[in-house]
């Protein structure tokens, strides 16, 4: 990345999908999960709850605070749990630096079984297997298809399942070119 031309990225999230940046080997979260137990979200829910006489939608179940049957405090389409669950996303800005290597974007099926640094280390350990990094750079190998075994996102998803994830698992990895 050209130091004189730094670029900004914006991460918009809702729910418990997470974007984690690898910066020179360190895991840097680029957003936060929307869980009812987190202080900011709890305050927002408490303010809403003051307007209503009952809070039977908010309860502790299966090791998580839940709103209705959801373990998140923000989501799209869950109108049954309005106004406690909001559809307003958070926006996070980040200025890319030359030591930024890649971003992992994944759903909670990954983050429930892997810590941020574990996922970052997994990708760093496997990024050179069959040149998987280059499949994410448009035009780098225009005449070669990425085989399933070469796909590092698939490898990370499979690793999360092997670690015991029982939730849905989806992963996107964006590598930054040093060119």
Swiss-Prot record:
Residues in PPM-type phosphatase domain copies: 1-176
Sorted UniProt keywords: Virion
Cellular location(s): Virion
SUPFAM superfamilies: PP2C-like
Chief location: virion
PROSITE patterns the UniProt entry points to: PPM_2
Protein name (record): PP2C-like domain-containing protein R307
Organism: Acanthamoeba polyphaga mimivirus
Classification lineage: Viruses, Varidnaviria, Bamfordvirae, Nucleocytoviricota, Megaviricetes
